[in-house]
């Protein structure tokens, strides 16, 4: 196979020459991604920033930021968005012990996801489940068969879960050096294996050895080896601190493992901070705790209270900028701000969906 890099560099150089002198830096694909992210965030108002940090982001038309729902599903196919190839559940895929096969499955899922997305954008469809950020795989440890979501996992073994999870992430995200085919998300971080009815106020207290040898290896592997683009925090608390604001977990992600993506809460977990756990007095206080801890995106909140938190002095706008920048980086890596001609996955046709080859 001939390398893609010279062609990509040529395309970028030609595009850079064609850009107008007044083109914003964030719109220039020849610029480093971090510089583009910083430039884009600097152009946003506080209310616009807050509106972009929830799953149903409204978008900012004046800057070309699209309306987008970060909530999409692809556990074993993209059938939530209509007809698609549906593969066996994760627990069955894991039973094959064949990580190459799981990689191929995820590669096909990513291709069908891009096909659906490309067609949706062509028809101005911005609905949930037609996006490219997928909250999968579920790499929790399936220890108790009474847990109602065990079939979503790769089983009870941390090594097998790591191998299956890394293979899935690499297949889904693709191998292009510049762009993601789709963005995967490792969930639920951490020690989320039931009991399901108590998940909004349950405090997990695993033995430290069990914590590090059983519950963490898959997450570490997906971050370090799989370069997973997102991590979702769990509803439960861990050692007395809700996972959405747990400094132990964020220290592992950002400082020990070198995570370079974005962190999203499970749906409604910010509300849990002031209703179930009562570690904050209200929504603004909860948002301040979450953003400061390391959370970038919240799911299930109809209206973000981040702007209110800043205006009340509970949070610095620079802290918001840091977390929003992580989100925007994912958008850049998916090619949302670049001409389709530069994004190799933008050409995947809808005919790939539920194709005989898959």
Show which residues each predicted segment covers.
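Glycoside hydrolase catalytic-domain context in secreted enzymes
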Residues: 19-358
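Positively charged n-region of N-terminal signal peptides that target proteins for export
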Residues: 1-5
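Bacterial N-terminal signal peptides
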Residues: 7-17
């Amino acid at each position: 196979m001939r390398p893609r890099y010279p062609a990509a560099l040529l395309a970028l150089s030609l595009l850079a020459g064609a850009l107008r002198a007044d083109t914003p830096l964030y719109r220039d694909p020849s610029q480093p991604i971090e510089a583009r992210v910083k430039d884009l965030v600097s152009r946003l108002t506080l209310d616009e920033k807050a509106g972009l940090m929830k799953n149903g982001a409204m978008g900012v038309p004046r800057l070309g930021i699209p309306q987008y729902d970060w909530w999409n599903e692809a556990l074993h196919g993209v059938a939530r968005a209509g007809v698609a190839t549906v593969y066996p559940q994760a627990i069955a895929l894991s039973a094959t012990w064949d990580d190459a096969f799981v990689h191929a499955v995820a590669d096909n899922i990513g291709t069908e996801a891009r096909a659906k997305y490309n067609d949706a954008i062509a028809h101005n469809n911005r609905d949930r489940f037609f996006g490219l950020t997928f909250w999968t795989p579920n790499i929790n440890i399936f220890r108790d068969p009474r847990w109602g979501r065990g079939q979503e996992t790769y089983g009870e073994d941390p090594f097998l879960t790591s191998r299956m999870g890394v293979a899935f992430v690499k297949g889904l995200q693709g191998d292009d050096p510049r762009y993601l085919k789709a963005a995967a998300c490792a969930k639920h971080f951490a020690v989320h294996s039931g009991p399901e009815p108590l998940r909004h106020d349950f405090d997990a207290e695993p033995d430290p050895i069990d914590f590090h040898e059983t519950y963490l290896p898959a997450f570490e592997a997906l971050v370090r080896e799989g370069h997973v683009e997102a991590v979702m925090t769990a509803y439960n608390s861990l050692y007395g601190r809700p996972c959405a604001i747990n400094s132990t977990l964020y220290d592992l992600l950002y400082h020990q493992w070198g995570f370079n993506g974005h962190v999203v809460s499970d749906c409604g977990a910010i509300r849990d901070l002031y209703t179930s756990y009562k570690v904050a007095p209200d929504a603004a206080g909860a948002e301040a705790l979450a953003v400061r801890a390391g959370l970038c995106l919240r799911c299930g909140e109809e209206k973000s209270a981040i702007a209110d938190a800043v205006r009340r002095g509970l949070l610095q706008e620079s802290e918001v900028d840091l977390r929003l920048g992580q989100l925007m980086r994912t958008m850049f890596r998916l090619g949302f701000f670049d001409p389709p001609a530069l994004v190799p996955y933008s050409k995947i046709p809808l005919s790939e969906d539920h194709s005989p080859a898959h």
